UniProtKB/Swiss-Prot annotation:
EC numbers: 2.5.1.147
Cofactor: how bound: Binds 1 [4Fe-4S] cluster. The cluster is coordinated with 3 cysteines and an exchangeable S-adenosyl-L-methionine.
Residues annotated as domain Radical SAM core: 56-290
Protein name: 5-amino-6-(D-ribitylamino)uracil--L-tyrosine 4-hydroxyphenyl transferase
Originating species: Methanoculleus marisnigri (strain ATCC 35101 / DSM 1498 / JR1)
Keyword Iron part of the UniProt annotation: yes
Pathway assignment: Cofactor biosynthesis; coenzyme F0 biosynthesis
Cited function: Catalyzes the radical-mediated synthesis of 5-amino-5-(4-hydroxybenzyl)-6-(D-ribitylimino)-5,6-dihydrouracil from 5-amino-6-(D-ribitylamino)uracil and L-tyrosine.
């Protein structure tokens, strides 16, 4: 039987012995093809078991996309609309409160809200949304906004990003979404999201949030026009931040949904990641991010079957129930609104594991 080349086998043996992967080693692993993919996945799976055992987790949450109106025009996004577009929408107080009441009736522990950059939003707009949710669902964990929204609110309000997050927290924000990271390489960002904050600004705002005691997720959006070296650089930036702050709750690989995006239609991006790339993203993340406990397999982005395979490749979490999801659907994903915990349990048990409900910050709940 053909085996993995000795130099790559040595990398896996070293990391299983406690060696910290370098960017160069990560690039070599991410570029692996043929049977070597399975060996990398197996090594990642072993590290996952050492770190978190055989529990698969999920969070009972509801997503609320408040508006698709956005001042930016990111090439990877099929969600954003401009004022006057026939399918543009904005949910005001009555609608947001109504959706929050639905969340309460569904017994969620988390409400997640990230939206377009509405032309008229400032920090008070975000604070009002959080306060409406908090009023309707007392005690719920509000996981919301991201560094881009923080920077936008700061610019619109004439205050610092730190002040924005202090005001957001006062209004009910619990943790910050680690989205808007995409690829933390500015040459790539200039192609896929030229109007978004740069890498340094994203990292600075995340560090500020963690310094304020506001924890966040960490993400990568891959499978468009980036290289393996870009992915490795991105992972290294996240690892460096986590070394400093210990503020990331999880890492979430987000596979690029290409179908309805300007970037793909203009020929500037490939048709998303392959299955090999998906598995290696989860596996190499587990091997590289030695200071992260949890890696989420987003069923919205990769589908339930690939999410289950990700659980064999280093991932330990299936994300949320969501109930409502618009951003991935508008980009061309299917069946993105809801995944029943019963189906998550079937996936976990198929692998001989136990499904447990968690909080946003990974405390296990009874039952």
């Amino acid at each position: 039987m053909k085996c993995m080349p000795p130099p790559l086998r040595e990398i896996l043996d070293d990391v299983l012995a406690g060696h910290r992967l370098t960017e160069e080693e990560a690039v070599r692993l991410l570029a692996t093809r043929d049977r070597g993919v399975w060996e990398i996945a197996a090594a990642a799976n072993e590290l996952r078991e050492r770190k978190v055992g055989n529990v698969v987790t999920y969070v009972r949450n509801q997503n609320i996309n408040v508006t698709n109106l956005c001042v930016n025009a990111c090439g990877f996004c099929g969600f954003s609309r401009k004022p006057g577009d026939a399918d543009a929408f904005f949910y005001g107080e009555t609608a947001v409160r109504g959706k929050a009441r639905e969340a309460r009736e569904r017994g969620v522990t988390e409400v997640c809200t990230v939206s377009g950059l509405h032309p008229e939003f400032d920090v008070q707009s975000y604070a009002e949304i959080y306060s409406w949710i908090r009023d309707e669902v007392p005690g719920v964990h509000i996981h919301a906004s991201n560094p881009m929204e923080v920077a936008y609110a700061a610019r619109r309000s004439g205050i610092s990003t730190r002040e924005v997050m202090e005001l957001m927290r006062g209004a009910g924000l619990s943790t910050l979404c680690g989205t808007a990271a995409e690829i933390l390489v500015d040459d790539v960002r200039r192609v896929i999201c030229p109007d978004k904050i740069d890498t340094g600004s994203w990292a600075r705002i995340i560090r500020e949030a963690h310094g304020l005691g506001i924890r966040s997720t960490a993400t990568i959006m891959y499978g468009h026009c980036e290289s393996e070296a870009d992915r490795a650089r991105h992972l290294n930036i996240l690892r460096e931040i986590q070394d400093e702050t210990h503020g990331f709750t999880e890492f979430v690989p987000l596979s690029f949904i290409h179908k309805n995006t300007p970037l793909y239609r203009a020929g500037l991006a490939r048709a998303g990641a392959t299955g090999r790339e998906d598995l290696l993203m989860f596996a190499v993340a587990r091997l590289f991010l030695d200071n992260f406990d949890h890696i989420q397999a987003s069923w919205v982005k990769v589908g339930t079957k690939m999410a289950e395979m990700a659980l064999l490749s280093g991932a330990d979490d299936l994300g949320g129930t969501l109930f409502e999801e618009s951003i991935s659907r508008e980009a061309g994903a299917r069946d993105t609104d809801y995944l029943d915990p019963a189906e998550m349990r079937r996936m976990a048990e198929d692998l001989g594991r136990v499904l447990r409900q968690r909080t946003t910050t990974y405390a296990l709940l009874p039952g």
